């Protein structure tokens, strides 16, 4: 393992509640969710993107919201830019 900053693709992990919700989504919504997760995984900076915004404007490096399926759903995630194994943690998923 090197001490250099690694780049994408980032690892993605979900909390247990988010994973349960993901498994209950209809197939079309799950596909849209995978698309946004793929974009986050391969983005050089996951906190920047067309459909990404901070959950709270006062905490720019805190949790962010990424929208999917034409803004019908969103995920709240945090990017942990550790030197060893940086990852994206999906904390909450919502779809309507």
Predicted regions and their residues:
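Basic, Lys/Arg-enriched alpha-helical interface segments
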Residues: 1-73, 80-96
């Amino acid at each position: 393992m090197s001490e250099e900053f690694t780049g994408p693709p980032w690892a993605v992990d979900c909390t247990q509640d988010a994973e349960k919700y993901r498994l209950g989504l209809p197939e079309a919504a799950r596909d849209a969710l995978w698309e946004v997760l793929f974009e986050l995984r391969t983005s050089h900076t996951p906190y920047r993107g067309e459909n990404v915004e901070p959950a709270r404007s006062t905490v720019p490096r805190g949790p962010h919201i990424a929208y999917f399926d034409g803004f019908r759903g969103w995920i709240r995630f945090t990017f942990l830019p550790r030197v060893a194994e940086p990852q994206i943690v999906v904390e909450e998923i919502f779809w309507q």
